Amino acid sequence: PVKWIIPGLLPAGLALFAGPSKAGKSWLTLWLCLQIAQGNPVWNREIEPRTVIYFSLEDTFNRLQNRIFQLIDGGDAPERLILQTECPSIGQGLEEQVDSLVHTYSDVGLIVIDTLQKVRLSDGNGGMYANDYKEAGSLKKLADKYGICILLIHHLRKQSASDPFDQISGSTGLMGVADTSWVMQRKRMSQTADILLTGRDMDDRTLHLREENCVWTLEDEETAEEREIKAVPDYLWKAAKYIESVGNWQG
């Protein structure tokens, strides 16, 4: 059976969450961490409280504390949320640090690395695909070993693509290893955003979100099948129903 961190959206395993720069990924990620650590609902889904370890590698503790204070409206940060602003790179001690943290906190469910680029070695040997596959594979091995989710915050390329998941920065090696991928689409300064989700253990779907006071709330969601149905013009559905009612068509 699939072990869900967020039912239907985020299972255990390796996950990617990619979006444009300055699109609000870190705010959204911190809110998710708080909700999971407190066992509060996420987008109409009931959450089992778990320890969350958040490597926020582009922030200071003061900035994180200010954001948490704003997100929880002056309340206390949950004990199950463990904040880290530094860690070694992949292959240089990160795996050992994760081992230690998982053994220290027995109910760890989610580890967030924000951002992936901060823990990469930038090794030019072997080519981009091989390096992406090796580094992501090392983290997936840890996620599978402990039955947890490791969520990597990442960037999108600026170039557009017909498939939004092709905009994830790096090679296809990252997507090839990841069990789950989220792509955030947001126009700059817009209060709305879409998150497209795909994964081995879930149906493809799109979440339509709205931001208010740095919290992203769910306005609507649809599966890939529902989205395809909506894309068909009404007159075609009416024609299909008419043909079905008369039994044949001559023209």
Question: Where are these predicted regions, by residue range?
Answer:
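Pre-Walker A adenine-sensing motif
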Residues: 1-10, 42
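Conserved inter-motif catalytic segment of the P-loop NTP-binding fold
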Residues: 5, 11, 47-134, 140-141, ...
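Hydrophobic positions on the alpha1 helix immediately C-terminal to the Walker A/P-loop
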Residues: 28, 32
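Post-Walker A helix-loop "phosphate-sensing" segment adjacent to the P-loop in P-loop NTPases
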Residues: 35-49
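Conserved, well-folded catalytic cores of nucleic-acid-processing
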Residues: 36-39, 71-74, 118-122, 142, ...
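Conserved alpha/beta core segments of nucleic-acid transaction machinery
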Residues: 199-250
